[in-house]
């Protein structure tokens, strides 16, 4: 039995469906929305609706955009000879935050995961190969996640790219800046050692 009026209970229930939102947080959000002025509630609802309706995937890289070709792909300031391959549009945001990468991206929209029934044909590998075969690409940086699925995807892609004569690299994994070696796990230490570079 709910202690709330049906519309409030439904709002709480909908908030609970969001990732990382438990019952208590859902209640707080629902009551916060109820306390908001109607104008702010309307703006929030419109922003959600507009984002859902107007956002699509870039026809070139698969990143989220509101145009056919995203601003990154259409920018003349980006190096189109280097493509960084990521699993998810959120990974593009993470890479852009460091302001180091000046090339283009390719979003796979997933990783190979036989346990979840996701094979190479279920993610955007063919589209990546098509971009490479256009001839302008000199390097592909594979930046999939450092987990079993990400590593399997990286290996699969690198084997497909190798015959095309394009340099293929994998981002290094290792000790975070400010971290202590004693707290790092064996895999992280091994990856850090493997990804070492000359100074």
Swiss-Prot record:
May play a role in DNA repair. It seems to be involved in an RecBC-independent recombinational process of DNA repair. It may act with RecF and RecO. Coiled coil: none annotated. Keywords: DNA damage, DNA recombination, DNA repair, Metal-binding, Zinc, Zinc-finger. SMART domains: TOPRIM. A zinc finger (C4-type) spans 58-73. Residues 81-176 form the Toprim domain. It comes from the Bacteria. One of its GO terms (biological process) is DNA recombination. The keyword Endoplasmic reticulum does not apply. InterPro entries: DNA_Rcmb_RecR (IPR000093), Rcmb_RecR (IPR023627), Rcmb_RecR_Znf (IPR015967), TOPRIM_dom (IPR006171), TOPRIM_RecR (IPR034137). The keyword Nucleotide-binding does not apply. PANTHER family: RECOMBINATION PROTEIN RECR. It comes from Acetivibrio thermocellus (strain ATCC 27405 / DSM 1237 / JCM 9322 / NBRC 103400 / NCIMB 10682 / NRRL B-4536 / VPI 7372) (Clostridium thermocellum). Belongs to the RecR family. NCBIfam families: recR (TIGR00615). This is Recombination protein RecR. GO terms for molecular function: DNA binding; zinc ion binding.
């Amino acid at each position: 039995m709910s202690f709330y009026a049906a519309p409030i209970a439904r709002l709480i229930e909908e908030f609970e469906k969001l990732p990382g939102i438990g019952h208590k947080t859902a209640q707080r959000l629902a009551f916060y929305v109820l306390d908001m002025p109607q104008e702010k509630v309307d703006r929030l609802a419109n922003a959600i609706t507009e984002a859902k309706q107007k956002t699509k995937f870039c026809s070139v890289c698969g990143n989220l955009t509101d145009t056919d070709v995203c601003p990154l792909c259409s920018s003349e300031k980006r190096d189109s000879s280097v493509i960084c391959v990521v699993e998810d549009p959120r990974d593009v945001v993470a890479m852009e935050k460091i302001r180091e990468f000046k090339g283009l991206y390719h979003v796979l929209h997933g990783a190979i995961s036989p346990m979840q029934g996701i094979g190479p044909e279920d993610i955007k590998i063919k589209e990546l190969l098509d971009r490479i075969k256009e001839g302008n690409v000199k390097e592909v940086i594979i930046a999939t996640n450092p987990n079993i699925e990400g590593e399997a995807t990286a290996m699969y892609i690198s084997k497909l790219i190798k015959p095309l004569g394009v340099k293929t690299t994998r981002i290094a994994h290792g000790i975070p800046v400010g971290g202590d070696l004693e707290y790092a796990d064996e895999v992280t230490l091994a990856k850090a050692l493997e990804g070492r570079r000359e100074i």
